């Protein structure tokens, strides 16, 4: 049998031109079971499947075997496969998965024998649930990832598919630290190779802007950007840019990083910075990026995460690839250099609240969590709603049929909506009018996972400074609308609640979905009984969206939908004024305490709870509704100390 030798070079053969010292050979076998005891299948990918196996020696060492799906034309092609070629050209490194042997079976299928680690980074994140890693653990993981990337880039390669699934992890003996190794070099390319490259590059959530905008040239900065996305996910256990498609991915990036133009980035050093080439690439695709102000990563985290860690994210997640640091420079960043959170400048009260140095994040709804398995790039981790009512509501809000407007065509005149990014911070109010003058960007995708924007706005509410001069009602102790129609609605609902044995005090409650549909368009309020029942069933599932407080749980539902249908039809023919409808939306939501008693809060300021928005309209979430309701004199008020996620409308 002819032997095809292969080996791992001990020197940098890419730039020195020296030939590596070959020490091993590609071996033939009838079946891989002949050489190893295959235990079980542990993973399946685009190019191959991974199996857990043990050697047939007394020591029974555990290994991982990647069996390639594509058959080889001849044995010599084994070392020409991109993954094998990349691993052979890279010298052994403690943060790169080691390759032990290469076998070809009788069917000419290649089997790569590698070292086995306990799990990958995605599995680790999924098992942590609401138990985030400590600051020291995140530092250690990111430091090892940067070391592995530095080794890959120094040897003239870039990975192109950096994602949590391709980061292998094993716990050390003390269980507080991890051994991290980069794996899966099936998409790796040499830095000095010429384009065009293969079309499939990286998983969308970790894909750099130059890849999304179809730039013909890209290099190692795509790995740095992906590392920044993973750093956020390691710390918060949630992805930062969970896009449904490439267009939605760009929107979420603009939502957090801001638009890559000079006008939007006129806010200092925060954000993704300016990238002039982005507009050129977008025009080639026939799209126009939204105009949004960037967010400050320092505002998204509590001490000590808001300092060195936030600074690292802002440097890694730059629009312009040339402005991202190299892997070697990343190792010199303050976050990777410090071994303890000694750089955190915070008050004693803040330090006492964060003694375990964990990320301070709000509760994530169960509907926003990531499923247990995701093995392919195109497999969606989002389960969008298909409700007929929500589709009508989408159409009523934006009226768009395409995710982006064409840059060369004049769009129809529409009302300018406030950018979510500008509502986020009062610092951006001065430039909000200038950067939101373009056509309102499409509504956020259905049931999107939480992003930093959702996390921050979860501790905020929308409040209106509109003063009510209407007389107080004796029974309800709240302002009543002035129109005869709304008075009739209140009387009808009062009669229904007084007849209810479970209600001790009368309170008007209407479906929040019905109220909002009335606010948008009278035609949308004429719904079938089936659609209303479907919407009511969504509200009945409220317990799984807000389990934080057992003493105060909001309840949003409609009373006797059949009896209300006639009133809704009459409203469609002669709707009241816009402000009167807003009063109906604000004042028909009640508060239910732990004993089941329904009471209506009396408060001069009108507010819409973030929990109400998240629960009753998962299609839009907080971020979209905040800009679409266009309440008079609306502003963002910080009530994070009062846990407004469990409060309801007065």
Curated annotation (Swiss-Prot):
Residues where Phosphothreonine is found: 469
Sites of Phosphotyrosine modification: 200
Domain of life: Eukaryota
EC number: 2.7.11.1
Keyword Nucleotide-binding appears in the UniProt entry: yes
Bias (Basic residues): 403-417
Enzyme class label: transferase
GO molecular function list: ATP binding; protein serine kinase activity; protein serine/threonine kinase activity
GO biological process: ascospore formation; intracellular signal transduction; regulation of meiotic nuclear division
Gene Ontology CC entries for this record: cell division site; cytoplasm; cytosol; nucleus
Chain positions recorded as ATP binding sites: 42-50, 66
Keyword Transcription regulation attached: no
Extent of Polar residues compositional bias: 536-556
Reaction catalyzed: L-seryl-[protein] + ATP = O-phospho-L-seryl-[protein] + ADP + H(+); L-threonyl-[protein] + ATP = O-phospho-L-threonyl-[protein] + ADP + H(+)
Region (Disordered): 397-428, 526-560
Keywords: ATP-binding, Kinase, Meiosis, Nucleotide-binding, Phosphoprotein, Serine/threonine-protein kinase, Sporulation, Transferase
Pfam families found in the cross-reference section: Pkinase
Active site: 161 (proton acceptor)
Record-annotated Protein kinase domain positions: 36-336
Protein purpose: Protein kinase which is essential for spore formation.
Protein family per UniProt: Belongs to the protein kinase superfamily. Ser/Thr protein kinase family.
Protein name (database record): Sporulation protein kinase pit1
């Amino acid at each position: 049998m002819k032997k095809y030798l292969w080996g791992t070079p001990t020197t940098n053969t890419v730039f020195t031109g020296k030939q590596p010292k070959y020490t091993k050979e590609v071996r033939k076998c009838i079946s891989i079971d002949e050489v190893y005891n295959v235990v079980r299948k542990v993973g399946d990918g685009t190019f191959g499947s991974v199996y857990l196996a043990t050697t047939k020696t007394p020591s029974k060492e555990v290994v991982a075997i990647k069996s390639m799906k594509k058959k080889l034309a001849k044995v010599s092609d084994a070392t020409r496969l991109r993954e094998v070629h990349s691993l052979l050209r890279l010298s052994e490194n403690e943060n790169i998965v080691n390759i032990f042997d290469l076998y070809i079976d009788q069917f000419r299928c290649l089997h790569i024998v590698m070292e086995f680690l306990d799990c990958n980074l995605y599995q680790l994140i999924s098992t942590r649930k609401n138990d985030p890693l400590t600051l020291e653990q995140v530092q250690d993981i990111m430091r090892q990832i940067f070391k592995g990337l530095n080794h890959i880039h120094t040897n003239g390669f870039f990975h192109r598919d950096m994602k949590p699934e391709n980061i292998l992890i094993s716990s050390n003996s003390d269980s507080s630290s991890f051994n991290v190794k980069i794996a899966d070099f099936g998409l790796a390319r040499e830095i000095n190779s010429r384009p065009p490259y293969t079309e499939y590059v990286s998983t969308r959530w970790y894909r750099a802007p130059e890849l999304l905008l179809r730039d013909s040239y890209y290099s190692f900065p795509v790995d740095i950007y992906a590392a920044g996305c993973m750093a956020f996910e390691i710390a918060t256990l949630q992805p930062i840019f969970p896009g449904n498609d490439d267009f939605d991915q760009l929107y979420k990036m603009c939502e957090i990083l801001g638009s890559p133009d000079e006008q939007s980035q006129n806010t200092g050093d925060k954000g993704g910075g300016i990238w002039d080439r982005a507009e050129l690439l977008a025009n080639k695709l026939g799209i126009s990026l939204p105009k949004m102000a960037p967010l400050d990563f320092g505002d998204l985290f509590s001490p000590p995460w808001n300092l060195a860690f936030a600074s690292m994210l802002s440097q890694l997640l730059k629009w312009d690839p040339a402005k991202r640091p190299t892997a070697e420079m990343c190792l010199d960043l303050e976050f990777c250099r410090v071994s303890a959170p000694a750089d955190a400048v915070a008050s004693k009260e803040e330090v006492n609240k964060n003694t375990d140095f964990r990320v301070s994040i709000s509760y994530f709804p169960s509907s926003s969590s990531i499923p247990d398995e995701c093995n392919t790039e195109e497999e969606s981790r989002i389960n969008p709603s298909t409700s007929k009512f929500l589709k009508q509501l989408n159409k009523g809000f934006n009226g768009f049929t395409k995710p982006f407007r064409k840059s060369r065509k004049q769009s129809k005149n529409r009302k300018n909506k406030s950018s979510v990014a500008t509502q986020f911070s009062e610092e951006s109010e001065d430039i909000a009018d200038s950067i939101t003058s373009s056509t309102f960007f499409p509504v956020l995708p259905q049931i999107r996972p939480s992003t930093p924007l959702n996390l921050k706005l979860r501790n905020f509410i929308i409040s209106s400074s509109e003063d009510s001069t209407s007389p107080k009602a004796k029974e309800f102790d709240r302002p009543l609308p002035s129109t005869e129609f709304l008075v009739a609605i209140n009387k009808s609902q009062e009669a229904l609640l007084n007849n209810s044995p479970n209600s001790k005090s009368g309170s008007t409650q209407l479906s929040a979905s019905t109220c909002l549909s009335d606010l948008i368009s009278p035609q949308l309020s004429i719904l079938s009984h089936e659609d209303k029942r479907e919407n009511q069933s969504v509200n009945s599932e409220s317990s799984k969206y807000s389990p934080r407080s057992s003493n105060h749980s909001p309840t949003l539902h409609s009373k006797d939908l059949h009896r209300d249908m006639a009133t809704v039809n009459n409203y469609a023919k002669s709707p009241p004024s816009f402000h009167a409808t807003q009063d109906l939306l604000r004042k028909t939501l009640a508060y239910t305490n732990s004993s089941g008693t329904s009471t209506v809060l009396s408060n001069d300021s009108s507010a819409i709870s973030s929990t109400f928005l998240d629960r009753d309209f998962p299609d839009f979430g907080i971020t979209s509704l905040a800009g679409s309701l266009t309440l008079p004199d609306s502003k963002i008020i910080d009530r994070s100390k009062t846990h407004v996620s469990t409060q309801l409308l007065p």
